[in-house]
Amino acid sequence: MSKYLIYTCCFHQEIYTDVVSNLINSFKKSGSTADFLVYTTTQYKEIIQAKCPDANVLFLEKNFYKTMNQARISKLDIFDYPGIEKYEKILYVDADSLILKDPECVFDSIQDDVVYVVGEGNILNEGEYWGRSLFLKENPEYTDREGMSAFVLGFKNIQTIKKLFIKIKQSFYLDMYQNKLRFYDQPFFNFYLLQNKMCNTETFKSLARSRPTPEIALKDGLAIVHFAGCPGHGNVKLELINEFKSGLVVATPSVVDTPSVVATPSVVDTPSVSVANETIFLLQQQLEEMRQKTAQLEELLRKQLNQ
């Protein structure tokens, strides 16, 4: 039995079973000896098992998570898994990701009693993606600093982390009923992990990254790549994943056999790309707010027509 656990979540839309299948297959090819867990519904479990019949995957089932908000915060339920006490270290990976090599190097880098994440963006960015309103509510004079992405979370199996996850989840659901959520779970992870000084935002930068080119991913020896953008749109995710995989075939015959190299500064880290990513996130937020307003107007019209 492995002392390491990797897990992901699959709820809300059936097309994400295809997205998760890509992640599972990439994990298998990596040669990892870690256990792999999918948190999903009974229906999606059966679909995933049919798509990945040879994968030795564990499952945690919950059948009443239906909305995007529930899907996004489900990653915090990991301590509900009955066998969780068996593991020393745990690694969450977003479903819309690929594992390019044995993630043991990722587990080895988890040394302190904090959550390891990938630092990105700035917490006071107007796009709200990194928790601007939460930080300013705490302190209107809050000093800007680097934010973080929750697409990968590495941590030890300790009570401190479990209690922190419970606190984040409680705050998330309270806000969901009282206010309009912006970018789902991401702002809450930023606020609680950074405010409580409970995260390492540097170590994973050389191991995991969002949307690198295949060439840069191989050159920098990345273990995990994430296909950020368009949350809830599985077709877009699959297009991004397939495009990346095609690029990998051109770049190298075998990802698993590619020797890792020390990460070096690349075009992904340049300010121009960072600004572009922030612009993308801002546009996504605006589109989501427009979608919500349209739904509210449609509901209002239906009520008026039924009067």
Model-derived regions: residue spans:
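GT-A fold catalytic core of metal-dependent nucleotide-sugar glycosyltransferases
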Residues: 71-127
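N-terminal anchoring/stem segment of glycosyltransferases
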Residues: 1-66, 83-86, 228-237
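Non-transmembrane alpha-helical segments in soluble domains
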Residues: 24, 28, 107, 169, ...
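Conserved catalytic core of nucleotide-sugar-dependent glycosyltransferases
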Residues: 108-171
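A residue-level signal for conserved active-site and pocket-lining positions in enzyme catalytic cores
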Residues: 6, 27, 79, 96, ...
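A glycosyltransferase accessory/donor-loop signature
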Residues: 38, 143-145, 149, 155-260, ...
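Helical coiled-coil/dimerization "stalks"
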Residues: 292-307
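A structural signal for well-ordered alpha-helical segments within the folded catalytic domains
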Residues: 18-21, 73, 77, 183-191
